Amino acid sequence: MGDETARRLIDASEAGDWRTIRDVLSTVEDPDDFTFYVHRAAFVDGVENWVDEWVEAEPRSSLPLLVKGAGAIHWAWQARGSGRASTVGSEAFKVFFRRLKIAESCLEEVTERDRDGAAGWAFRVILGRARQLGIDETRRRFEEVRKRHPWHVEAHEHMLQQLCPKWGGSHEQMHRFALETLEAMPPGSPLGQLVPAAHLEHWLDLPSGEDAEYIGSDEVTAQLFEAANRSVLHPAYVRRPRWPTLHNSFAMAFCWSGELVAAAQQFDVIGDLVTEWPWQYAGNTVAVFQDYRRRAYEVVGR
């Protein structure tokens, strides 16, 4: 992962040490960093076993409710699994939706208590999609995040997911959102990553043969380079927590599009900090990453 703060939060969560989680999160001021670190603390197996102790100990604080609500989203996905809806049994869906309601209840209270906070609304964007509340409701929640932090990274990522065909959107809506964000975002913003993310989602939906033709097209390749130049390759770009995910997504998209020289540049930045997403789309995360890194480095003579 390469992030000592994230590692500390995960270790504390696994140990049920909510005091350490509270102390660490209380020092994080940037809204994107804060949401990222809440995610790291909450998306750990077993949070539901200790978080109520924290809620009871600090009933006036919204932070334990935020962690409980975010943790309940992870808990719900544990019941559902990561496959498409057609692979999920009816009993698993019942547990999934029941746990999502717990998350919604907690996060609704968070957004009522902390009127200026973006994180509660950001996690409610996830819930809009997971609870199948529809694009309009998820977008309403997304706009609540934007009122508080216009370029919130996780909120944009989850809004993009809502616009994917598998969640009720379309390729057209998904790409439009990614490209409009790219056009409007500040120079060097990590949100340029929405463009490769959208193309990888589109690639995943296509049958063999069509997928390679699509992602290797001149139009897609041009958009990938434009997105990289406006974000991770821009002089204003600054690495912040979760930066490996951005570079891994560009690396995979460049690999799939046949632009191995550009991919090698991303692998140089990544080092060994492989992230599960998006490489798991193509099989074993580490094996696929290492294979394509080797191919990219062979092209540049390493």
Please identify what each model-predicted range represents.
Residues 27-58, 70-187, 192-225, 270-273, ...:
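Short coil/linker segments at helix-helix boundaries
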Residues 8-12, 38-42, 129-130, 238-240:
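A short, ordered amphipathic alpha-helix with a cationic face
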Residues 1-24:
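Compositionally biased, long intrinsically disordered regions
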Residues 246-282:
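C-terminal structured domain segments
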Residues 207-249, 255-256, 261-262:
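Intrinsically disordered, low-complexity segments enriched in Gly and acidic/Ser/Thr residues
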